[in-house]
Amino acid sequence: SCLVGSEMCIRDRFNISSKTFVSVAAGVKISELENLLPSSKIFRAMPNVGAKDNLGITAIYSNHDSKEMVEKFKFIGESYEVENEDQIDLHTVLIGSGPAFFYDLMQEFEKRLDELLTDKESKRLVSIVFLSSIINAIKNGENLEELVESVASKGGTTEAALQKLDEKGFKKIFSEAVDAGIKRAKELSMN
């Protein structure tokens, strides 16, 4: 007999002591899971929202060989193994939260386009601008700096706008935002 709901009872009742487990819980370290499931193979996987369209990007970490698990996660998009568990935090902020950064920026584009077009037209055109930019980056395989330069003519409107972003510290603000996300991820793993 065991205490219903206790960790030991769950392990015994469902015979899960030597199974493979994949955790997608943010902030839950492998060591915590190993305490619950000492004889199991445990993997941490952090997919992003693109997984629902088979365009996900998943970081995988384990104390075991992760090559097979990396292959299994390719059914929802790209996947890769991180060398240490702390790298999951950076992945979570840049890849997991990344879509929210794009959506937020897209909203700002829409607000300005709303000065010219209807809300529906603005949403559609902004989505096309982002989509075509992404396709161009993937298709051409150029570095992003070269792609920026291909759009920004010397003395032109794009160059003026980019200079204003630099002047206002856009890159520094972005870096600080990423650092804030990583800090929060570390706080979550301590709770």
Predicted regions and their residues:
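Single conserved hydrophobic/aromatic residue that forms the stacking wall/gate
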Residues: 1-5, 9-10
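Short, conserved loop/helix-junction motifs that constitute active-site signature segments
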Residues: 13-18, 35-38
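ADP-ribose/adenylate-binding Rossmann-like module
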Residues: 15-29
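Internal alpha-helical scaffold of NAD(P)-dependent oxidoreductase catalytic cores
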Residues: 32-41, 57-90, 100-142, 180, ...
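Active-site capping/gating segments
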Residues: 44-59
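NAD(P)-dependent Rossmann-like dehydrogenase/reductase catalytic/cofactor-binding core
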Residues: 127-191
